Amino acid sequence: MSRPERLQPGVKLRDADKVSRIPVKVVPSERETMLRKPDWLRVKLPASNQRIVDIKQALRKNGLHSVCEEASCPNLAECFNHGTATFMILGAICTRRCPFCDVAHGRPLKPDAEEPVKLAQTIRDMKLKYVVITSVDRDDLRDGGAQHFADCIREIRKLNPEIKIEILVPDFRGRIDAALEILATEPPDVFNHNLETAPKHYRKARPGANYQWSLDLLKKFKEQHPHIPTKSGLMMGLGETNEEIAEVLRDLRAHNVEMLTLGQYLQPSKFHLPVERYVPPAEFDELKDYAEEIGFTHAACGPMVRSSYHADLQAQGKEVK
C-alpha cells in the first residue's frame, strides 16, 4: 500500500483532493440527484459592483484574505456592496478537511508577522466601524493561532480606536486554556465560535472537531469575560432534524451563549456534502422564536444567514434574516 503523498507547504487542495482522506467518504454528486434550489433561495445581485471591486483591490494590495471569497459565500456581493467583509487571518490554507467548507486544505505557510499591521491599515483606509476577524484552523501552531488573533486586535485598535471587533475563532483543539489566556490580553467585543451542526453529524461534517470541546470553549470564554457577548452559528440541510437543532440551542444556552446565527447549508461543489433538504423560511422563523423563548438575546435565522452576515446589525440587536 503506497503512502499518502506528503503535503507541500503553501499548496491548496480543493474538492476531491481535499476530501479524499476523511472518515466518512463523500460520493461526488450527480446533477440528476442534486436538489433544485427553491425560488426563495435565489441570491439578488446588487445594481453596482464598484464597491465590490474596491474591496477586492484593497485586499489584494495588502495580501489579505476574506472568508467571503475563500469559502465562496453566497452573500459576497451583498456584503461587499454594503462595505463589509470578514477578514481571514493566518493564510488561506486550513489544516482540517471539513467537507461542507470550500476553504482549501493543505500545509499552511508560516504566519505573516506583518499581517496585523496591514490588516489594521486596510480597515482604517476602508473606514470600517465594525469588523469580523476569522481564521483557518491552524493545528500546526502551538497556540492554534491565538497570539496572531491578539496581535491583530491590538494593531486594529491602535489605528481604529472606536471600532468594534468580533472574532470568529477555530476550536483551538487541545489548546483551549492556553488560547484563552492569550486572548484575555486583547479581548474582542464579540466572541464567536460555530458549532456548525448537531453532534450526531460531527463525524461526517466536522472530522477532527468535538462538539463538547466547542461548547467548553464558549463557556470558558464567557466565564472569564462575563460582559462580552458570545455567539455561535449552525447550518441546516445536512440531514439534521429541527428537534436536533433545538437541542443544540438548549446546549448553547446551558453554556451561556447569547447570540445565534442559523442558515441554510449550500453545497460548494459536487465533491462536498450534498444538501439533503432546503429548509423553508417558516421553519427558520419557528426556530428563531424558540431561540428567543429560551433566552438568546439575538437570533438571526433565515436561509441566507451566515455567521458574519450583517454582523454589525446582529450586534446591535437588529433584525437579520
UniProtKB/Swiss-Prot annotation:
PANTHER family: LIPOYL SYNTHASE (PTHR10949), LIPOYL SYNTHASE, MITOCHONDRIAL (PTHR10949:SF0). One of its GO terms (cellular component) is cytoplasm. Disulfide bonds: none annotated. [4Fe-4S] cluster 1 binds at residues 68, 73, 79, 308. Keywords: 4Fe-4S, Cytoplasm, Iron, Iron-sulfur, Metal-binding, S-adenosyl-L-methionine, Transferase. Pathway: Protein modification; protein lipoylation via endogenous pathway; protein N(6)-(lipoyl)lysine from octanoyl-[acyl-carrier-protein]: step 2/2. Its cofactor is [4Fe-4S] cluster. Binds 2 [4Fe-4S] clusters per subunit. One cluster is coordinated with 3 cysteines and an exchangeable S-adenosyl-L-methionine. This is Lipoyl synthase. The keyword Phosphoprotein does not apply. It comes from Shewanella loihica (strain ATCC BAA-1088 / PV-4).
